[in-house]
């Protein structure tokens, strides 16, 4: 929807093909930077998070204040529809359906074949397209059919239950606090969460481990926090990409964006900001390809994204690969997060969407604190 909006507002003829019948499974967190960069009204926020609580394997809590700012929470059904409507208002044609395959007409122009309507089993329709932006999720059919090495993507499998939020705050739940559990019974290699969304709350978990019971984990978490008494509204599951794909375009007419390109932050699973950023960069790449009449411009989407965010993804990937591997390391990871410099730099990076280079002494302190935990010189 972001890519469609960007191109439509520039006067391009755009078809937005979307599986509008499906609510995207998502924790729903957005940084204030997203509201600014993409002109999103604060009225779409259903909650403002002022604190994050990290719970270690031994049950030790670290409460991290957000500081100056907040983490916004959105409901994806409302938020995504607003994005689609904005694209349509800018001039994009909307159509509900699902991508089936790409074909080519006799003159070499691509033709997108899709199922029409609110089901994958609808009648097949087709439309000619000079360029195609594939933003059809982690298991993207556009990527699998059109992009080299798309099968190299790896995923965390996530599951959450949307429940009615408790009427009152308690030790186990607060309407303005996100809780993140680093405990192997809840996730052997990722984390479990409780994310308030105003009237509703997302309770979920993720894991790379096949056979791990995600539903069982959420049931245990709900029972431990008393949220098993809350009414369940719906349940959802979806894969979360672990790494950006190595190639985002086919060198001819297709470029990827969002989960289809693998742009979900390692360690945190944050994806909305990066999906919208990828959508804008894909639109820029298509605009450049149209202007220059060269499909080489499509490669600029990945180059620009990785130049802006690749370092953050690299750091988060290292963090996940090391600190999430067992409960001993996760206990130490949570202990490190008690450090005020770690807290401040983490949320500064989250808010601004870049690594913070200020206060070099803080980085030195954090480095030696990490080193102490890695070598076992520090105690938890």
Walk through the language-model features, giving the residues of each:
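Glycine-rich FAD pyrophosphate-binding loop
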Residues: 2-26
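Generic enzyme active-site microenvironment
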Residues: 16, 134, 257
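A conserved beta-strand/loop capping segment in the N-terminal third of enzymes
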Residues: 33-86, 97, 102
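Short, hinge-like loop/turn segments at secondary-structure boundaries
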Residues: 31-35, 151-152
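FAD/FMN-dependent oxidoreductases across multiple families
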Residues: 209-286
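C-terminal helical "tail/cap" subdomain of flavin- and related membrane-associated enzymes
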Residues: 287-380
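Predominantly flavin-linked oxidoreductase catalytic cores and closely associated redox partners
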Residues: 6, 86-231, 246, 262
